Amino acid sequence: MNSLTNIEDLNCDNQHIPNGFRRWIFSTNHKDIGIMYIIFAIFAGVVGGLFSLLFRLELAMPGGTFLNHNFQLYNVLITVHAIIMVFFMIMPALFSGFGNYFVPLLIGAPDMAFPRLNNISFWLLIPAFLLLISSTFIDGGPGTGWTLYPPLSNLNGHTGAAVDVAIFSLHLTGLSSILGSINLIVTIFNMRTPGMGLFKMPLFVWSILVTAFLIILAMPVLSGAITMLLTDRNFGTTFFKPDGGGDPLLFQHLFWFFGHPEVYIVILPGFGIVSQVISTFSRKPIFGYQGMVGAMVIIGFVGFIVWAHHMFTVGLSYNALIYFTAGTMIIAVPTGIKIFSWIATMWGGSITFPTPMLFAIGFIILFTIGGVTGIILSNSALDRVLHDTYYVVAHFHYTMSLGALFTAFAGFYYWFGKISGKQYPEILGKIHFWITFIGVNLTFFPQHFLGLAGMPRRIPDYPEAFAGWNMVSSIGAGISIFAAFYFVFIVFYTLKYGKNCTANPWGDGADTLEWKLNSPPPFHTFETPPHIVE
């Protein structure tokens, strides 16, 4: 456990806080920018969730009952839903939001290394989001799926400008992520307070550091692929057109070389949050700290060399199938290290169960289910049957929708008092957890059965044999959307009626630097660097 000298310098009153819109529009303060990221992520999450409710209403019953057989609109809904949730909800919340706000606090830095770069990193997201939403109203919208596979995304499949606008949106959000990653890496390496070595950093900071490297390595590959697609569509190149000597499979390789690390870009900050939460509410240091760091690094590395498990059905060679099957299964080893280390941390601990701990334990259970179905899908022979069925939809939602989302809620409830100065009512938080837990499981668990029965994804109609589980899934989606609006209600209720939050509402289990500061922290923190002593 770390202790501090010169604590009296941490909460200074000489703040010089800017007023009005200038504080937010022109902000270079890492805490304000982190808050803007989190607010943006909540808004985008509600919008993306409403998109999903629309196509779940279509899927509630067979026969084109809601969208009136407008299959292009259905494809646009699933495309925009996925892009919003990945690029505008989970990443801005976990990596950019909590990362911006808490990394400097956790390492004792006065701010981020490049404050103005931090500002533009956020404001790039706004035009990116507007471009994506506007693309849905252009020439029928981008009905390609979030993967943008040619030839469907080429001029053969989409003659209008919708796909081009969506590509520009992805360019901007990718640039935002890369700039933010550079900022966080420089901050973590150069601005740690005296006495805080790399292996004294909290695991959340480690998770952000590994994620930032993944973004810098993966995002340019996506940018290159969609730029090549853009030139195919507009400038006569044939990168992905067989009639000009190109190959649409090249796009799949490029996309998934980004796309699989993206899965870990989404979940690794969540791993860090869960480590903080479980350690705090078990009143114990995390079990196997160095092993947890090593597991994150290995997950990040191996995540780059197994991309083609998304492509088992495209005609890969036998040797490639063997390699990608084995490599994918190997990822379960470092992930298992993390799961068992969290359980070992709780073992023998003095555990309490406030809302953040409930979401963290819920994450472990649901992410483990998603991991087990991932091992099943890693088998290339089984994947021949299950590829592009609802079994895959269930798998990746158990890791992302029920995994990363639960870590975001855990982090939000854990740190909301610190950010706002108001502590949420515990009973409301626990009700939110149980509504969400029931809703998302009702939504996605039946999809395993649908996938095993052979129901294909991305198809808006289906035989009546699948109607029962689809209705259950759609009811679950409605409950989940209700939970999202209930969460927004909790936020506003807490801001208006919540009790003032103390510097450390969680007790002696919360021993990281941010809990030494007032709630909310001063506008400028650590103007005199704290010194960490063991």
UniProtKB/Swiss-Prot annotation:
One of its GO terms (molecular function) is metal ion binding. It catalyses: 4 Fe(II)-[cytochrome c] + O2 + 8 H(+)(in) = 4 Fe(III)-[cytochrome c] + 2 H2O + 4 H(+)(out). Cytochrome c oxidase is the component of the respiratory chain that catalyzes the reduction of oxygen to water. Subunits 1-3 form the functional core of the enzyme complex. CO I is the catalytic subunit of the enzyme. Electrons originating in cytochrome c are transferred via the copper A center of subunit 2 and heme A of subunit 1 to the bimetallic center formed by heme A3 and copper B. It comes from the Bacteria. InterPro entries: Cyt_c_oxase-like_su1_dom (IPR023616), Cyt_c_oxase-like_su1_sf (IPR036927), Cyt_C_Oxase_1 (IPR000883), Cyt_c_Oxase_su1_BS (IPR023615), Cyt_c_oxase_su1_dom (IPR033944), Cyt_c_oxidase_su1_bac (IPR014241). Cu cation binds at H260, Y264, H309, H310. Keywords: Cell membrane, Copper, Electron transport, Heme, Iron, Membrane, Metal-binding, Respiratory chain, Translocase, Transmembrane, Transmembrane helix, Transport. The gene is ctaD. This is Probable cytochrome c oxidase subunit 1. The chain crosses the membrane at residues 35-55, 76-96, 97-117, 120-140, 165-185, 202-222, 254-274, 286-306, 320-340, 357-377, 396-416, 433-453, 475-495. Belongs to the heme-copper respiratory oxidase family. GO terms for biological process: electron transport coupled proton transport; oxidative phosphorylation; respiratory electron transport chain. It is found in: Cell membrane. SUPFAM superfamilies: Cytochrome c oxidase subunit I-like. It is a multi-pass membrane protein. Its main location: membrane. Heme a3 binds at H395. Fe(II)-heme a binds at H81, H397. There is a cross-link at H260-Y264 (1'-histidyl-3'-tyrosine (His-Tyr)). Its EC number is 7.1.1.9.
